[in-house]
Regions:
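Hydrophobic targeting/anchoring helices
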Residues: 1-100, 209, 232-234, 240-243
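A conserved amphipathic helix/loop scaffold
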Residues: 91, 101, 105-107, 117-336
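Short secondary-structure capping/turn micro-motifs that flank functional sites
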Residues: 43-44, 109-111, 149-150
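Conserved acidic residues
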Residues: 33, 111-114
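Hydrophobic, well-ordered secondary-structure elements that form the walls
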Residues: 27, 76, 114, 283, ...
Length: 336
């Protein structure tokens, strides 16, 4: 089963009307079949919220112009069993890093990319389900919290353990040779506290890391298993600190999720990406300033059409440059 509706309210949004409208956009972009404005009495009768009804009405008029063209949302399958608990908001934080996810309460055995946060470890059959996916060529992405909760059961896949030690980090590196070595030094927005994941060199590949003193700590690890692979993302103790990973590290993380997607975002956190099976995408910035970003698009895409502004944007070298404005949606049709 799944929830096919959505609702939002105006409370605590008077400081910025955009914060109210964003709730509406997110509900509609997820293609909820029913939208409830809560509470209608407040919106109509309470002078505090007198501006909310006209602006949300204008929003509905705007979205009516293109919502029917978008098709169905697509994203990496994010499995969380009905009674699973742990890292409860991680999907929201990853979404704010520009990673489209499609939530599932049943294990998505037919999907090629599967995301498992800590709550997925509450499925007593999760190890056998993961094995089947990877033996059939699938990519499974897990969090450090999933590794911690699964405990010794995770050793079935790779020799990685969640240690009791922490590290405060602010400088990072990525790998340009699929994990053979790391290179570069990229400074995060601010220091981030992460768990130290223990792993054996040459048993697993480090795709992104954080620098310590004469050492480094893994941020993204990957290992082959059967015809597939498993990747591990280190989640900061404060999940919101994912936003403070530098662009280069975020690009590594997005790449894990994006191999089945029509486009992958390259840019800072705070930029959302919505993907659809029709070949449309929406890019929306929640940053408080303008920002230039890039979409890495699927092979064969030669241009994008902004269907709101009726502007064509050429693709060069598989990349589409975009100028984002706070709270403004770029609704794009990717054209081959």
């Amino acid at each position: 089963g799944r929830n096919l509706g959505g609702w939002f309210d105006p409370y605590e949004c008077t400081y910025n009307l955009t914060s109210y409208l964003e709730q509406a956009y997110l509900t509609l972009f997820a293609k909820a079949r029913e939208v409830a404005l809560f509470s209608l009495g407040s919106i109509i009768d309470d002078p505090t919220f007198r501006l909310f009804a006209p602006v949300v009405g204008e929003l509905f008029d705007e979205v009516d112009g293109y919502l029917g063209q978008l098709g169905n949302p697509v994203g990496a399958a994010a499995y969380r069993p009905a009674n699973g608990r742990g890292e409860d908001n991680i999907h929201n934080y990853l979404g704010m890093c520009g990673i489209p996810l499609e939530p599932c309460i049943d294990y998505p055995e037919k999907e090629k990319v599967i995301f498992l946060a800590e709550g997925a470890a509450d499925d007593p059959m999760i190890v056998s389900k993961m094995k089947k996916s990877m033996l059939e060529g699938g990519s499974v992405i897990v969090t450090s919290g999933f590794v911690r909760k699964l405990g010794d059961g995770f050793s079935e896949f790779v020799n990685v353990k969640y240690s009791a030690r922490k590290a405060m980090v602010s400088e990072f590196a990525d790998s340009k040779n699929s994990g053979v070595s790391i290179s570069g030094k990229y400074t995060g927005v601010k220091p981030v506290l992460i768990p130290q994941m223990e792993y054996c060199t040459n048993d697993v590949w480090e795709l992104a890391a954080a620098y310590g003193t004469d050492n480094n700590f893994p941020v993204v690890l990957r290992c082959s298993y059967g015809d597939g692979n498993i990747s591990i993302i280190t989640i900061p103790d404060d999940m919101g600190d994912l936003y403070h990973y530098p662009v280069q590290v975020l690009s590594v993380i997005r790449g894990l999720f994006g191999k089945e997607m029509p486009a992958v975002l390259e840019g800072p956190a705070g930029i959302q990406l919505f993907s659809y099976d029709s070949g449309h995408v929406i890019v929306r910035s929640d940053l408080p300033y303008m920002e230039d970003v890039t979409l890495k698009v699927a092979d064969g895409v030669r241009m994008a059409k902004d269907i709101v502004r009726n502007v064509e944007i050429p693709v060069t070298g598989g990349r589409l440059p975009l100028h984002t404005v706070p709270g403004v949606n770029c609704v794009l049709e990717l054209i081959k």
